Amino acid sequence: MKKTHITEQNFADLGLQPQVIDGLNAKGFIKCTPIQAKALPVLLAGQDIAGQAQTGTGKTLAFLTATFNHLLTTPAPEGRKITQPRAIIMAPTRELAIQIFNDAESLIASTGLKAALAYGGERYEKQQQVIEQGVDILIGTTGRIIDFYKQGHIDFKMIQAVVLDEADRMFDLGFIKDIRFIFRRMPAPTERLNMLFSATLSYRVQELAFEHMQEPEHVVVEPEQKTGHRIKEELFYPSNDHKMALLQTLIEEEWPDRAIIFANTKHKCESVWGHLAADKHRVGLLTGDVPQKKRERILEEFTQGNVDILVATDVAARGLHIPQVTHVFNFDLPNEAEDYVHRIGRTGRAGASGNSISFACEEYAINLPAIEEYIEHSIPQSDYDASALLEDLPAPLRLQRRPQQNRRNNNGQRQGGNRKHTRPRQPRNTQS
């Protein structure tokens, strides 16, 4: 869990329970971020909120702190069984659910509360065993949570606090029926503390809040710039024939320490991965079809620096806390303007600078006007010299073949990946 820009509001001055303060202090959280400073006083007064905040603003810590404090100050319902959760936190993706759980585990020890994780792609029995040992806070994706409910392993009759994170993404992924199924089996909104967070408070998100919350107060924290002033943006107009060669040439020139490459489809991601893996880059692939255990391993390797480049669909663009990403490449311009902001927001975090390089190709250049209208500025354009693009590139690997990821031989010398230039490059001409 990162420490983002802060305010002068101290957690210790909010009237939180000592156990909660102890957990925050142990992790070095002393002062609030803007979303925490705005949301926590409202929540500690027992008022529901619908919060608008981007990923990376500290909203996870806000709703975890409020949830812990509410459960510590509110008696557990009489007759509650240990398998009946008192709070539920719903996330749109497995990766986000895991991240929330990890953040909760880092703070929860001093409270005496127990958290459990429920998401698809992981062994059902393993998660069930944890729940059967007792759960106060259930964190997970809606599908697996409903599976446990229908099998009789949990119910929602004793819920005292609810968090819906990335509500707009829930709509995008088609999970709203699941959310309503869960809400309708809980106590009435007046009998629980309700928290909704979303990158945008669109009409449909506000309608959901109206249906299942008790007069929520809207709390809005917007960045000064949608794309962040520390992110250097750059746009190229490659032909389809030049697109892959331009990407590989830019990787050679930029030499990114840690980069994420976004493409719009699973097939395109696999193609990009195949070209980079064949060129001996340490590259990982993150799409919806990658098995969950492998996804977790890839994210861990990327976070630890054992993988330099992650090729991903938008499944990785929101909710994940991946530190020190130096470059984001939009191999395809996203179809939704908001996704551009979420993608490039993976870099330039926690005061660091970052680089965003986007391709307006023949297929996706049509998305550019909507993106620039949304971010309220034009993306600076750069030209490239087609004759300077890499040509000596190996044939791409197929996904079923395991690429050689080791960059060092037995003598400790580096092999492949970010190869030295075989000839001088022509400098790029950047237009303001």
UniProtKB/Swiss-Prot annotation:
Gene3D superfamilies: P-loop containing nucleotide triphosphate hydrolases
Residue span, Helicase ATP-binding domain: 40-219
Highest taxon of source: Bacteria
Protein residues bound to ATP: A53, Q54, T55, G56, T57, G58, K59, T60
Annotated PROSITE patterns: DEAD_ATP_HELICASE, HELICASE_ATP_BIND_1, HELICASE_CTER, Q_MOTIF
Bias kind Basic residues: ranges: 417-426
Principal localisation: cytoplasm
Annotated catalysed reactions: ATP + H2O = ADP + phosphate + H(+)
EC number(s) recorded for this UniProt protein: 3.6.4.13
Keyword tags: ATP-binding, Cytoplasm, Helicase, Hydrolase, Nucleotide-binding, RNA-binding
One protein family per Pfam: Helicase_C
Listed InterPro entries: DEAD/DEAH_box_helicase_dom, DEAD_box_RNA_helicase, Helicase_ATP-bd, Helicase_C-like, P-loop_NTPase, RNA-helicase_DEAD-box_CS, RNA_helicase_ATP-dep_RhlB, RNA_helicase_DEAD_Q_motif
A GO term, aspect molecular function: ATP hydrolysis activity
Motif Q motif, residue range(s) on this chain: 9-37
Residues annotated as domain Helicase C-terminal: 245-390
Membrane in keyword set: no
Cellular component, GO annotation: cytosol
Summary of subunit composition and partner proteins: Component of the RNA degradosome, which is a multiprotein complex involved in RNA processing and mRNA degradation.
Function description: DEAD-box RNA helicase involved in RNA degradation. Has RNA-dependent ATPase activity and unwinds double-stranded RNA.
Family under the similarity heading: Belongs to the DEAD box helicase family. RhlB subfamily.
The protein's name in its UniProt record: ATP-dependent RNA helicase RhlB
Encoding gene, per UniProt annotation: rhlB
